[in-house]
C-alpha cells in the first residue's frame, strides 16, 4: 500500500489548527473536531484520528516546556530540595542547615503544589467519566454550544474582573498564588472536558474570579496544561491498537507532532504579548460568531 499524501496533508492541517488554538481561549479540541469533519479527516476507522489529535497536543505541550524551561526546571529542583530538606530537618541534628534550604526552596515547592492542586479536579473527573465524555460530548453540536456559552462567559467574567481590578489588589506574580486560588482555577479547568469550552478559557476565567491578573492566569494555564494533557494523552495512547498503523499514519504522526510544536512556539509568545496590551473580548466575540455559524451549518445539514 502506497503513501496517501492527501491524508498527510489533511493531518498537517489539523496540526496547524492545534498549534494555533491550543493556548488561546477558543477551544483547540472544538476546532479540530470541526475542521476534521469539514476535510473528512475524522472518517478513518480504527481510532487513528483521535489518537493523532492526542499526539499533536503533546507537540503543543512540548512548546510550553521549551519556552518556560527555566521556570519549570528550577521549580522541579526546588520542589525536590524542599522535600529532602524537610525530611532532613526531621531526622538530622543539623537543623539550621536544613531550615536554610527550606527557606531557599519554598517558592518552587509552593509553585509545584499549586500546579498539583490545580490539576486534581479535572484529573478526577476525566478519569471517572473518560468514556462518557468521548461518547457524548465529542460532536459538532456540543462544540457549537460550547463555543457560544464559553464566549458569553468570557465577556461577562472579564468585564467583572476589570471592574474589580480597579478597586482591589490582584496577583501579578505567579509565585504569589495561594493554594485556594489554584484550586479554584483547577475546578474551572473541569469545564474544558466539554469540547468547545476551551481549557485555556476555562482556567483563565477561574484565574480572574480568584483574583489573578490576566497574564498570571494565562501562564498558570500553560503550566497546568503539562500534567493535564500528558495524563489524558497517556490514557488514550495506552489504549490504542498500534498494530493497525501503516506508513501513512506514522509519517502523519511524526510531521504533525513537529508542526504543532513549531506553530505553538510562535502562538504562545504572540499571545502573551497580546494580553499585556489588549482584552480577551476579540476571542469571545469570535467564539460566539463561530458557534452561531456552526449551529446554522448543523441545522441546514451542511455538516453533521
Curated annotation (Swiss-Prot):
Membrane-spanning ranges: 5-25, 47-67, 72-92, 111-131, 137-157, 209-231, 248-268, 283-303
Biological process terms in GO annotation: cell wall organization; peptidoglycan biosynthetic process; regulation of cell shape; response to antibiotic
Note: Bacitracin is thought to be involved in the inhibition of peptidoglycan synthesis by sequestering undecaprenyl diphosphate, thereby reducing the pool of lipid carrier available.
UniProt keyword annotations, A-Z: Antibiotic resistance, Cell membrane, Cell shape, Cell wall biogenesis/degradation, Hydrolase, Membrane, Peptidoglycan synthesis, Transmembrane, Transmembrane helix
Listed HAMAP family: Undec_diphosphatase
GO molecular function: undecaprenyl-diphosphatase activity
E.C. no: 3.6.1.27
Protein name: Undecaprenyl-diphosphatase
Reactions this protein catalyses: di-trans,octa-cis-undecaprenyl diphosphate + H2O = di-trans,octa-cis-undecaprenyl phosphate + phosphate + H(+)
Family (UniProt): Belongs to the UppP family.
Main location: membrane
Amino acid at each position: 500500500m502506497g503513501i496517501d499524501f492527501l491524508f498527510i496533508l489533511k493531518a498537517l492541517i489539523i496540526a496547524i489548527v492545534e498549534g494555533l488554538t491550543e493556548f488561546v481561549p477558543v477551544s483547540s479540541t472544538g476546532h479540530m473536531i470541526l475542521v476534521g469533519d469539514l476535510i473528512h479527516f475524522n472518517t478513518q476507522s480504527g481510532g487513528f484520528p483521535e489518537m493523532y489529535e492526542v499526539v499533536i497536543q503533546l507537540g503543543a505541550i512540548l512548546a510550553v516546556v521549551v519556552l518556560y524551561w527555566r521556570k519549570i526546571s528550577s521549580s522541579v529542583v526546588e520542589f525536590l530540595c524542599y522535600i529532602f530538606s524537610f525530611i532532613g530537618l526531621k531526622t538530622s541534628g543539623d537543623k539550621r542547615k536544613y531550615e536554610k534550604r527550606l527557606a531557599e526552596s519554598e517558592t518552587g515547592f509552593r509553585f509545584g503544589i499549586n500546579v498539583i492542586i490545580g490539576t486534581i479536579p479535572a484529573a478526577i473527573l476525566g478519569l471517572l467519566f473518560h468514556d462518557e465524555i468521548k461518547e457524548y460530548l465529542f460532536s459538532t453540536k456540543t462544540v457549537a454550544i460550547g463555543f457560544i456559552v464559553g464566549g458569553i462567559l468570557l465577556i461577562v467574567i472579564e468585564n467583572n474582573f476589570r471592574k474589580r481590578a480597579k478597586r482591589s489588589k490582584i496577583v501579578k506574580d505567579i509565585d504569589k498564588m495561594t493554594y485556594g486560588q489554584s484550586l479554584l482555577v483547577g475546578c474551572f479547568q473541569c469545564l474544558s472536558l466539554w469540547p468547545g469550552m476551551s481549557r485555556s478559557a476555562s482556567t483563565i476565567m477561574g484565574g480572574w474570579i480568584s483574583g489573578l491578573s490576566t497574564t498570571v492566569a494565562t501562564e498558570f494555564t500553560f503550566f497546568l496544561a503539562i500534567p493535564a494533557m500528558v495524563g489524558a494523552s497517556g490514557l488514550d495512547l495506552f489504549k490504542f491498537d498500534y498494530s493497525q498503523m501503516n506508513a501513512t499514519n506514522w509519517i502523519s504522526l511524526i510531521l504533525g507532532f513537529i508542526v504543532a510544536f513549531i506553530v505553538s512556539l510562535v502562538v504562545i509568545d504572540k499571545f502573551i504579548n497580546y494580553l499585556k496590551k489588549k482584552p480577551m473580548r476579540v476571542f469571545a466575540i469570535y467564539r460566539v460568531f463561530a458557534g452561531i455559524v456552526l449551529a446554522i451549518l448543523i441545522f441546514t445539514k451542511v455538516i453533521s
